[in-house]
Structures are given as structure tokens and as C-alpha cells.
């Protein structure tokens, strides 16, 4: 058996063990592909044993808002209670994903970091003034959606949230807990 085949078999065994434990790991940027992969795993667990808890482990620098909200919406539609655990980093859309669990089910490991900020448009912006105006209105709608998520999750005022996301705001796990982004610090998966 070639090294590549052995590596693929090992990866499959590991993936199966993780899914059998009802864990889904999201350890990459939020893209259409990574979101689709996560959604497939989440729904596999939902359909094979509905209503049983799932742990969604996040280590992501963020990425696509639309792809992230696709994962968010799917989790909200499931009957299985989902617990989020940040390990490492939940930045930008990764931080939003960490909030898709119900209150009391949002955790981070002790050395994790959370970063929140307002959405941005990447790359060079070109087009007619009317098109640019459309893009500006769309990003403001996206900002409002994200602010609303942080408002609901944290209980902070709109003014506090808008100030916090005006620029990149980095938090330790303890700071994120104090801010209301987390319900607790997780020292062992046995504590879930």
C-alpha cells in the first residue's frame, strides 16, 4: 500500500472516530467549501441520531460571511443541541460561528482568543457609482446582522457592540466570557 493510501485510510479512521463521538471540527477559514463540509457532517449526525448533543469545535480565522451564516442557519434548524468550543482562535466570522449554540452551550479552551470586528470588502473595488452604492448598502446590512448576533449573545448595548467592532477587538477566553461571548472556559471535554 502506498504512503498516500495509508494516510488516506488513517484520515478516514480518525474522521469516523470523531463523528462517532458526535464532534465536528471546523479548523480552517470560513469558505463555501468548508461550510458545506461542516454542514454535511452536522446533518449526518442530526439524521443518524436526532436530538443527541453535538460538539462543534472551532479554530478559524474567519472568512466568508455568507458561508458562515449558512452554517449558522443549519445549526439553528437542527433538533440536536449543539455546543460550541473555541480552541485556538475564533476570529471574525469564526467568532460569529462560536455564538450559534444556545446560551449555556458556548465555551472556549483557556488559551483561546476571540476577535470581533465589522465586516469588510476585500480586493480592489471597481464599478459605477451606483454599483458601489449598492455594495455599501449591502455591507451595512451585513454589519447590522452581525451586530444583532453579538447583541443577542452578549446582552451588551448596541453602542458597546458597535464600538467594540469598529476596529479589531482581540480578547482572551476570560475577556470574551466577561464580555458575554462565552458561557465558560472548558478545561476538559469531560466537563461538557
Swiss-Prot record:
GO terms for molecular function: ATP-dependent peptidase activity; ATPase binding; serine-type endopeptidase activity. The active site is at 92 (nucleophile), 117. Keywords: Cytoplasm, Hydrolase, Protease, Serine protease. It catalyses: Hydrolysis of proteins to small peptides in the presence of ATP and magnesium. alpha-casein is the usual test substrate. In the absence of ATP, only oligopeptides shorter than five residues are hydrolyzed (such as succinyl-Leu-Tyr-|-NHMec, and Leu-Tyr-Leu-|-Tyr-Trp, in which cleavage of the -Tyr-|-Leu- and -Tyr-|-Trp bonds also occurs). Its EC number is 3.4.21.92. Belongs to the peptidase S14 family. This is ATP-dependent Clp protease proteolytic subunit 1. It comes from Chlamydia abortus (strain DSM 27085 / S26/3) (Chlamydophila abortus).
Amino acid at each position: 500500500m502506498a504512503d498516500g493510501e495509508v494516510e488516506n485510510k488513517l484520515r478516514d479512521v480518525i474522521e469516523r472516530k470523531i463523528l462517532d463521538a458526535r464532534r465536528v471540527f471546523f479548523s480552517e477559514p470560513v469558505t463555501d467549501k468548508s461550510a458545506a463540509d461542516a454542514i454535511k457532517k452536522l446533518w449526518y449526525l442530526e439524521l443518524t441520531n436526532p436530538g443527541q448533543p453535538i460538539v462543534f469545535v472551532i479554530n478559524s480565522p474567519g472568512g466568508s460571511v455568507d458561508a458562515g451564516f449558512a452554517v449558522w442557519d443549519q445549526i439553528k434548524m437542527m433538533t440536536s443541541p449543539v455546543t460550541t468550543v473555541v480552541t485556538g482562535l475564533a476570529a471574525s466570522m469564526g467568532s460569529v460561528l462560536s455564538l450559534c449554540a444556545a446560551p449555556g452551550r458556548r465555551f472556549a479552551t483557556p488559551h483561546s482568543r476571540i476577535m470581533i470586528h465589522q465586516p469588510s470588502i476585500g480586493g480592489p473595488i471597481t464599478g459605477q457609482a451606483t454599483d458601489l452604492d449598492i455594495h455599501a448598502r449591502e455591507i451595512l446590512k451585513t454589519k447590522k446582522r452581525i451586530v444583532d448576533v453579538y447583541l443577542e449573545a452578549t446582552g451588551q448595548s448596541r453602542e458597546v457592540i458597535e464600538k467594540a467592532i469598529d476596529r479589531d477587538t482581540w480578547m482572551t477566553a476570560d475577556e470574551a466570557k466577561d464580555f458575554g461571548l462565552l458561557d465558560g472556559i472548558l478545561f476538559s471535554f469531560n466537563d461538557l
